[in-house]
Amino acid sequence: MTPDTLMTPEKIFLDGKTFIPAEQLPIPEWPCVVSERSQPTLTVKDDDLFFVTDTIGNISACSLNDGNPSMGLFCCDTRFLNRLELQVEGRSPVLLSSTAEKGFSLSVLCTTPKIDDRLKAETIGIRREIVLNGALFEEIEVSNYSTTTVNFELTISFDADFVDLFEVRGYDREKRGRLLRLVEPTAEEGTFSLVDGVSPIPKESSTSREESLTLAYQGLDGSVMESR
């Protein structure tokens, strides 16, 4: 635990931020895309930071449970992301090409599947550039190849389990720390709302800060780790 960390039985205060145990504010799960077969993986690396993903650039929570448990964003032998999944209307994009030949970056070109009668197959091109340089950076470019306007939902889902490499390889731990949620006080004293955009926050607060997503974990030694 650092000198800037204060704790109560229900809250953790760290560098001006407030965390509470994740079970106090459960987040509705966003369905993952189930693949009928095990997906090949690509790996990019920068010093002690490495990223194992499928060829689309996704880390699917379903894949972790169905044959690819080693995928994720890792640093210092800990997995800081166990889900990073881009979906088109709840479906996986269709891969056209991907390469990780540079070693520290991943380039992906994919397109959209057919979505009922609203979106024809291969109407939209999606280019993903994922780079490791002390952190993970991603740029997404979306191109419309039709002659008309199209409407569709493009989503990216994140999650972090903060397991170590031994757990990834199948070893069990007798005890684990706890997952945390970053929250902000609401106008009503004693209540909190999620900063992650799932629950509304006070209007004056939302306009004064950048939109962000923070996933956190408190280890058995009291230290707090964050994925931001």
What feature does the model see in each segment?
Residues 1-228:
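Terminal accessory carbohydrate-recognition/targeting modules of carbohydrate-active enzymes
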